[in-house]
């Protein structure tokens, strides 16, 4: 866990541009390290997860860009697009935080078909209507990496179906701020 003294934050605010550039540099280094681990794992699926608001989508997009700059073909999926329609949810799916809200079979099927090099209809979820709002085509490749990001990607209900082919990545802001009282 990173620890920052409150006084250092105050000093950093005197040069906001430098502070932002340093934060970006730290983030880039973490993306670079994650990409290296993913490439060395020889596993074609990245299951990226973290709590709500942790930066999963941003991290997944940055990881995708980084890998593509290395010449790797990447397919990026958001688990949010694989939610079941509200009227088809089982009783266990009490809220959006429940893994039972996810159409796991469709998610796993799309991942598998992308890795087989097939063109796949990827759903997009309409949260206002509470159902799939349509589909967009995505072309897979035999040697591609599929990054699937979402709050439940490391949940055993999902991860156990892809475990042998997946690298798990957990994203969370973990910075402790020290005040004069600490």
Task: Outline where the language-model segments fall.
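ATP-dependent NMP and nucleoside kinases share a basic, alpha-helical "lid"
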Residues: 142-143, 148-182
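Hydrophobic anchor at the beta1->P-loop junction of P-loop NTPases
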Residues: 46-48
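Conserved nucleotide-sensing/catalytic segment adjacent to the nucleotide-binding pocket
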Residues: 75-77, 84-130, 145
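Walker A (P-loop) phosphate-binding loop of P-loop NTPases
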Residues: 53
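Post-Walker A helix-loop "phosphate-sensing" segment adjacent to the P-loop in P-loop NTPases
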Residues: 65-75
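Conserved lysine of the Walker
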Residues: 56
